[in-house]
A protein has these predicted regions:
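Accessory RNA 3′-end/elbow-binding domains used by RNA modification enzymes
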Residues: 1-50, 110, 176, 195-304
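The conserved catalytic core of RNA pseudouridine synthases
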Residues: 31, 37, 55-59, 149-197
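Glycine/acidic-rich beta-strand-loop module
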Residues: 43-73, 142
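Residue-level signal for inorganic ion chemistry
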Residues: 60, 81, 137, 188, ...
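Structural signature of FAD isoalloxazine-binding scaffolds in flavoprotein oxidoreductases
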Residues: 70-85, 150-164
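Acidic, low-complexity central loop/insert segments
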Residues: 71-127
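Extended alpha-helical targeting/anchoring segments
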Residues: 130-131, 135-157
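Pseudouridine synthase
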Residues: 132, 139, 144, 172-214
Length: 304
C-alpha cells in the first residue's frame, strides 16, 4: 500500500475497492500487524460495512480505537450512486436476481426530483434482505444466501441531503446524498423504483466521505490520531491529577471546554457525543457530564 503509515492504534482511512468485502480489509490489516509483531494480537475492526459491489472510504479501527465503533454511526456519510431504472433485484444491486421489470421510458427529471423529495429527513426504512443486519443473532445476508426467507423490521434512518447529479434517461441517473449511519442506499433505489412504477437498483456506489474524512483513493491509507479522532466532540485538557481521579472513578470539575475541531453540517442531528479528554496531546478518555461534574465514560489506555 503506497504511502501507508504504520498500523498504530487509532483510526485509519482506507479505500475499499470494487469486488472485495469490508472484512477483507480487516484481514489484511490483521496480517500486517501479525507480521510486524509476531504473536501479539491487536484488535481490528471496520467502522461500517461497504458491500462488495461498492467502493470508497472504509474506516479501519485498530487497538483501543475499536471501542469507538458505536460513536461513528451518527455522523454524516457521503455517497455517490448510479441508479439503473427498469429492473428491481432481490439484493438491490447489480449482483442480484431480477424480481421485477418495468418500463422507464416515461421518466422525467421532474418526476425523479418529486419522488426523491419524500425521502429527505427521518423515515422508517426496510433494510435489504442481503444486508449485514442481524436476524436471530446472524447476519441477514447469510440466511438469504442459504435461500431462507428474510423479513427484516424497518429501522429509523435519516437522509440529510439528496440531489440528482445527472441523468441518462430512461436508463440511469446519478445520485449524490448525505445520510446518517444505518441508511441503505440500495433500499432508497428500490423504493424510488416502486414509487415511479418501473423498478430500480444500484449499479455503483461510492462512499466519498465520513464526517470530515475523505476517501484517500486506491492503494492509499491515512492514520488519524490525537485531535483528528472524533473531531465533532468538544475537548477537555486533563492534568496528571485529573487523570488519576478519573481512573479511581472519581468526578472532576467541568473546567474549560474547547469547541469541536469540526462542525456538523447545519441541521444535521446532534450525535450527542461524549467529551474528549486529552492528556499530553493524546486522547485518553471519553467523559460524560453527571451532576455538574465529569466522570469517565471510557478509558483509552495508552491514548490515541
Amino acid at each position: 500500500m503506497r504511502d501507508a503509515p504504520p498500523l498504530a492504534p487509532g483510526i485509519h482511512l482506507v479505500h475499499k475497492p470494487l469486488g472485495e468485502t469490508s472484512f477483507s480489509s480487516v484481514r489484511a490489516a490483521m496480517a500486517e500487524l501479525e507480521a510486524a509483531r509476531p504473536g501479539k494480537r491487536v484488535p481490528v475492526c471496520h467502522g461500517g460495512t461497504l458491500d462488495p459491489f461498492a467502493e470508497g472510504l472504509l474506516l479501519l479501527l485498530v487497538g483501543q480505537a475499536t471501542r469507538l465503533m458505536d460513536l461513528l454511526h451518527a455522523v454524516p456519510k457521503h455517497y455517490v450512486a448510479q441508479v439503473i431504472w427498469g429492473t428491481e433485484t432481490d439484493t438491490g444491486d447489480l449482483l442480484g436476481r431480477v424480481v421485477h421489470a418495468g418500463d422507464p421510458s416515461a421518466l422525467t427529471p421532474g418526476a425523479l426530483e418529486a419522488a426523491l423529495a419524500g425521502f429527505r429527513g427521518w423515515q422508517d426504512q426496510v433494510p435489504p434482505a442481503t444486508s449485514a443486519k442481524k436476524l436471530g443473532g446472524e447476519p441477514a445476508y447469510r440466511k438469504a444466501h442459504r435461500g431462507e426467507e428474510v423479513v427484516l423490521p424497518p429501522s429509523r434512518v435519516y437522509l440529510h441531503e439528496a440531489r440528482w447529479r445527472s441523468h441518462e434517461l430512461p436508463r440511469s441517473s446519478q445520485l449524490e446524498l448525505v445520510c446518517r449511519g444505518g441508511f441503505y442506499v440500495r433500499s432508497l433505489a428500490r423504493e424510488l423504483g416502486r414509487i415511479l412504477g418501473c423498478g430500480a437498483h444500484l449499479a455503483r456506489l461510492h462512499r466519498t466521505a465520513i464526517g470530515p474524512w475523505e476517501d484517500p483513493g486506491p492503494g492509499r491509507r491515512m492514520g488519524l490520531h490525537g485531535r483528528q479522532v472524533l473531531p465533532w466532540s468538544a475537548l477537555r485538557e486533563l492534568s496528571d491529577a485529573e487523570v488519576g481521579e478519573l481512573r479511581r472513578e472519581r468526578p472532576i470539575a467541568l473546567g474549560r471546554l474547547l469547541p469541536p475541531d469540526w462542525r456538523l453540517p447545519p441541521g444535521f442531528p446532534d450525535p450527542e457525543a461524549p467529551v474528549r479528554g486529552f492528556h499530553l496531546g493524546r486522547l485518553v478518555a471519553l467523559l460524560r457530564e453527571q451532576e455538574g461534574a465529569f466522570r469517565m465514560q471510557m478509558e483509552l489506555r495508552g491514548g490515541l
